[in-house]
Amino acid sequence: MGTTCNVVVLISGSGSNLQALIDSQHEGNPARIRAVIANRADAFGLTRAKGAGIPTAVLDHKAFDGREAFDAALMELIDAHAPDLVLLAGFMRILSPGFVRHYHGRLLNIHPSLLPKYKGLDTHRRALEAGEAEHGCSVHFVTEELDGGPVVLQAA
């Protein structure tokens, strides 16, 4: 990866995780966000990125005939930035096996639960309904199994 780790961040919404990533960019931190890509034009995270001077793009999944066509266009857009890592930060799309394989070993997801508990959606509601005493966040490698890749980091 060299001295700098070029990162492309994918979002769908408010970009609160993106903001934490932006705030962590400082001298001494090798990670550099090179682009933020959203699948929704109304994602507030785009405003956060623009405010930080980070290039943005929108690729609306509804404009494509199926997941594979969208993912192919998304790969082309991502690859134009030559990232070392692709980070899903609230990106609310299930990615095709071909996409996952293309970025194998450099595709990470921020998931709002202590995996392997509460994979998928509605993690906070499910944790509350289960009476969990502890809840947290996981960063994991993306594999073809939904929220099933190796966990890199967890915090409660």
Where is each model-derived feature located?
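Short beta->alpha connector loops at strand-helix junctions that form conserved
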Residues: 57-62, 110
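N-terminal glycine-rich "phosphate-gripper" loop used for MgATP/nucleotide binding
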Residues: 38-39, 63, 67-68, 81-97
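Residue-level detector of anion-binding/catalytic polar loops
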Residues: 55, 84, 133
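N-terminal Rossmann-like dinucleotide-binding module
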Residues: 1-48
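Short, structured coil segments at secondary-structure junctions
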Residues: 52-53, 103
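Donor/substrate-binding cores of folate-linked one-carbon enzymes
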Residues: 24, 31, 39, 89-156
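Active-site-proximal loop/hinge segments within enzyme catalytic domains
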Residues: 2-6, 71, 75-76, 80-84, ...
